[in-house]
Amino acid sequence: MLPYMDQVLRAFYQSTHWSTQNSYEDITATSRTLLDFRIPSAIHLQISNKSTPNTFNSLDFSTRSRINGSLSYLYSDAQQLENFMRNSTDIPLQDATETYRQLQPNLNFSVSSGNTLSSDNTTVDNDKKLLHDSKFVKKSLYYGRMYYPSSDLEAMIIKRLNPQTQFMLKGVSSFKESLNVLTCYFQRDSHRNLQEWIFSTSDLLCGYRVLHNFLTTPSKFNTSLYNNSSLSLGAEFWLGLVSLSPGCSTTLRYYTHSTNTGRPLTLTLSWNPLFGHISSTYSAKTGTNSTFCAKYDFNLYSIESNLSFGCEFWQKKHHLLETNKNNNDKLEPISDELVDINSNSRATKLLHENVPDLNLAVNDIPSTLDIPVHKQKLLNDLTYAFSSSLRKIDEERSTIEKFDNKINSSIFTSVWKLSTSLRDKTLKLLWEGKWRGFLISAGTELVFTRGFQESLSDDEKNDNAISISATDTENGNIPVFPTKFGIQFQYST
């Protein structure tokens, strides 16, 4: 479940029109969410409150070998921040948990053509962005957290300098470990690419990240084309000035929708040339209430590989319509009446409706124009061909929009998350749901291997309380035991 302060941070980005989908740090966020989700390791309770429209606080308790806790405080001067925040009772489950991330396409519109090539939704978004840029006011966010009984501190400051740039400062201080780390981020987002300069006092680490979006131009024949694909390429470079340790990686991401079903899918390919590590992922929404992800890792130097799988199963409310109870994931064919209804709600007509019927317009042609019969037949054939092609584009767009609207309008009550790795022989199970105003997460991680305990450190053995009998080892039995188990409760007002 997404922590409360992360929800506030996401609301701050939304209120200040800062997109996180262009960040190289989150380029593989979908696969990480479906495969590497966090399992609670103890009984955890989080109570949060919005004391004023601009201040938020949170209190955490956990019982892991002893009672631990933390106190968090956040302040922001963003005026519309409260419009994006909801308490634990009202927030939709799909917004309170990390799940499949749907991206917005990056369209390249010509300046001279204005909005003639843009879709209705994109036009509205561009108008909002232009209005925001013209009336931009600098916004800030201040966050602090103190842990007890260790008295560790962490802090974060975010400054929106202008509509395209942002400055972030993060700090961690630990008296017990004599650790004090300060990290600075300067980000510049030009919509087509996002550049990020990073400096950390730990090893005097310097870093540079960049993510470039290959913008696509809509068709000249389509004044309302729903562009459903996005291609991005990013890279990062690191250098520790003290140890002179370099680091780098690059990732390619492709996001699109299936034109037949409207279901989104994401493909990524990552490469680390220094360590010879190659990773590829495939993530897809297989239905309105199910998601699947597969990841393959391979190392060029050690010839080691790993295959991981992850999936999600969402449960809706039981009082749905009878027609949708048995066919939650079945997309019905779009009828002509539905297309006409959707067209009336848009400012721009559908494409095939803009094509004139030459058979009806032949009487309106001036008598001075004498069109031969064979040319008239050719024009009619071309009109029919273009009309059918444009109708197909409209139906594909309507299918994609229908699938997205079906997910957004659904009310989910719980979700099951499963993840497994063939090399590590682990199985992670997580259940997340809502109950009487509480957001609940409960899960466990199971291990199916004999030599797993030897690979763990002493701290992990003590924390997880793992013990394997000598009889199982001598007999060669493969033990099945949980390395983690916990439950987490969140409540916010």
Curated annotation (Swiss-Prot):
- Where is this protein chiefly located? mitochondrion
**UniProt keyword terms in alphabetical order:** Membrane, Mitochondrion, Mitochondrion outer membrane, Transmembrane, Transmembrane beta strand
- Name the InterPro entries for this protein: Mdm10
Highest taxon in the source lineage: Eukaryota
Question: Which Pfam family would be a valid example here?
Answer: MDM10
- Membrane topology, from the record: Multi-pass membrane protein
Cellular component terms (Gene Ontology): ERMES complex; mitochondrial intermembrane space; mitochondrial outer membrane; SAM complex
Asked if the Swiss-Prot or TrEMBL record annotates the protein with the keyword Membrane, the reply is yes
Q: Which GO terms describe its biological process?
A: establishment of mitochondrion localization; mitochondrial genome maintenance; mitochondrial outer membrane translocase complex assembly; mitochondrion-endoplasmic reticulum membrane tethering; phospholipid transport; protein insertion into mitochondrial outer membrane
Provide the protein's localization. Mitochondrion outer membrane
Record-stated family: Belongs to the MDM10 family.
Tell what the record comments on domains. Lacks alpha-helical transmembrane segments, suggesting that it resides in the membrane via beta-sheet conformations similar to those predicted for other outer membrane proteins and porin.
What is its quaternary makeup?
Component of the ER-mitochondria encounter structure (ERMES) or MDM complex, composed of MMM1, MDM10, MDM12 and MDM34. Associates with the mitochondrial outer membrane sorting assembly machinery SAM(core) complex, which consists of SAM35, SAM37 and SAM50, to form a SAM(holo) complex.
- What role is this protein assigned? Component of the ERMES/MDM complex, which serves as a molecular tether to connect the endoplasmic reticulum and mitochondria. Components of this complex are involved in the control of mitochondrial shape and protein biogenesis and may function in phospholipid exchange. MDM10 is involved in the late assembly steps of the general translocase of the mitochondrial outer membrane (TOM complex). Functions in the TOM40-specific route of the assembly of outer membrane beta-barrel proteins, including the association of TOM40 with the receptor TOM22 and small TOM proteins.
Name the record gives this protein:
Mitochondrial distribution and morphology protein 10
Q: Which organism is it from?
A: Saccharomyces cerevisiae (strain AWRI1631)
* Gene giving rise to this polypeptide: MDM10
